[in-house]
Amino acid sequence: MQLWAALWNIPRISPVVGKARRWRAAVEQMLVIGVCALPMAGLMSLSIGFVLALQSGAELRRFGALERVVDVIAIAFTREMGALITAIAVSGRSASAISAEVGTMVVTEEMDALRVMGLDPVEFTLAPKYLGALITVPCLTALCTFCGIFAGYLFLAFSIDMSFQVYFRRVFEAILLRDVWLTIVKSLVFATIIVQVGYLQGLRVSGGPDAVGRATTVAVVKSTLLVIVADVIATSLFYLMGWSAAG
């Protein structure tokens, strides 16, 4: 239901895209949503990339095809792991922050104050978060994808002394343009889910400050689960369309 609600709210926030004051608020949200999640997302990508290279390399070495680790890492992170790792990191860091912020505004009746002042709470509070997430999450996904691929290079550099130039030449040979479009679409969908779930959970806060803490926990759990479900659906659809086929 949160995903449908997110799609329903997009027309409501589109008129405010051109307003300078919203862009200023959106830049602040970029720092909160993207920059603050970068260390965790980058470390996760490096760790998972190295482990994936290590495990796949152990099997491929038996067939004398250790250099094929490049293809495994490049395709896995470009199509799947980069966007998913980023979304999970942003979900844990930002869904809770959004839920806590909005929930506190509800408890302290700031939302009602905005309505009394003649301001649309959705335009004032939700639009900057959407803009910040839709801009930042794809950029963060690109950085995490690079971190994961670079971890594969570190493994092969120590294993078979593969040079930086050779490694990344093979990376660009393995990656197709449709793989890039696939991860961009995924990152935009994931950003929408994370912001919408955090916002809705914050709006549902009732009672005292304890309710805000519960809402943040629920926001992280729901957003992470919905991101994984959306990833499965998107990957399945693109597979049926032939976008995930080799060649």
What does each model-found stretch correspond to?
Residues 48-49, 190-199, 227-235:
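Hydrophobic core segments of alpha-helical transmembrane domains in multi-pass membrane transport
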Residues 54-79, 145-188, 192, 196-218, ...:
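Membrane-interfacial helix-loop-helix connectors in multipass membrane proteins
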